[in-house]
């Protein structure tokens, strides 16, 4: 089963959107297998955003993600990476469609509430970076037979 990493950034936590965001993913039928509230270290932030290290906005990304608590999550399900990206919406909330998390709750590209892995390899790297395998729970929701054939 496919897995993805999703993080509710400090602005989403401070604005009280954690429950709303989790509910949207659960309502789609995706399964939460890992969750923790983290005060992100400088080291973790720099590793997470390593691909942007040479970009002019790298330091502002690191500063923001370390500015408050982050809810780190691992979700699993059929096509979860693409579906979660669609549910999250475009990076710039002003361009995100209504009905997406960023379209409904975001205003500023620098405060866009949530991060989601953009592909299988990225998801694997981010999950390994943020979670130890022992922190991920293998379980079967009773509703699973009503969601998947």
UniProtKB/Swiss-Prot annotation:
Protein family (similarity comment): Belongs to the NDK family.
Gene that this polypeptide is encoded by: ndk
Source organism (scientific name): Synechococcus sp. (strain JA-2-3B'a(2-13)) (Cyanobacteria bacterium Yellowstone B-Prime)
Subunit structure: Homotetramer.
Record field: catalytic activity: dZDP + ATP = dZTP + ADP; a 2'-deoxyribonucleoside 5'-diphosphate + ATP = a 2'-deoxyribonucleoside 5'-triphosphate + ADP; a ribonucleoside 5'-diphosphate + ATP = a ribonucleoside 5'-triphosphate + ADP
Record keywords: ATP-binding, Cytoplasm, Kinase, Magnesium, Metal-binding, Nucleotide metabolism, Nucleotide-binding, Phosphoprotein, Transferase
Enzyme Commission number: 2.7.4.6
Protein's UniProt keywords contain Cytoplasm: yes
PROSITE patterns for this protein: NDPK, NDPK_LIKE
Pathway: Purine metabolism
Any matching Pfam family: NDK
Name of this protein: Nucleoside diphosphate kinase
Gene Ontology MF annotations: ATP binding; metal ion binding; nucleoside diphosphate kinase activity
